Amino acid sequence: MKITRFGVSVPDELLEKFDRIIEEKGYVNRSEAIRDLMRDFIVRHEWEEGDREVAGTITIVYNHDEADVVKELLELQHDYVDEIVSSLHVHMDEHNCLEVVVVKGKAGRIKEIAERLISLKGVKHGKLVMTTTGRELV
């Protein structure tokens, strides 16, 4: 892989803050931190394009005592069998459950799945975490 060196002009205060953060996070140098930022920027762009193949997780916390929430959750997951790769179910306490759904597919479709899961009656909190399939990252 060919590496290109380039210069970036930034205010001193911004660079000082950046250097403190990359040291806290354990980066060995600025270049690796900047590469990670560039990769994250590319991944976010992939998600903006609804027809791109992406991956992610949808995490929800719900009250399993809520009428029909478990049934609706299972039905919804079966509606998207091509995009839902797997799921993990955790009993948080006697009433609350955490479900992590691993998804892969077109960005627009993944967002649709997340919106439907998160908006189910009985879901207390939900979050879509987006990432990449890794195919186009170096």
UniProtKB/Swiss-Prot annotation:
Cofactor binding mode and count: Binds 1 nickel ion per subunit.
Cofactors named for this entry: Ni(2+)
Annotated positions binding Ni(2+): 78, 89, 91, 97
Pfam families: NikR_C, RHH_1
Keywords in alphabetical order: DNA-binding, Metal-binding, Nickel, Transcription, Transcription regulation
GO biological process: response to nickel cation
Extent of the signal sequence: none
SUPFAM superfamilies assigned to the protein according to its UniProt record, in alphabetical order: ACT-like, Ribbon-helix-helix
GO molecular function: DNA binding; DNA-binding transcription factor activity; nickel cation binding
Highest taxon in the source lineage: Archaea
Annotated family: Belongs to the transcriptional regulatory CopG/NikR family.
Function of the molecule: Transcriptional regulator.
NCBIfam families in UniProt: PRK00630.1, PRK01002.1, PRK02967.1, PRK04460.1
Annotated protein name in UniProt: Putative nickel-responsive regulator
Organism: Thermococcus onnurineus (strain NA1)
Lineage: Archaea, Methanobacteriati, Methanobacteriota, Thermococci, Thermococcales
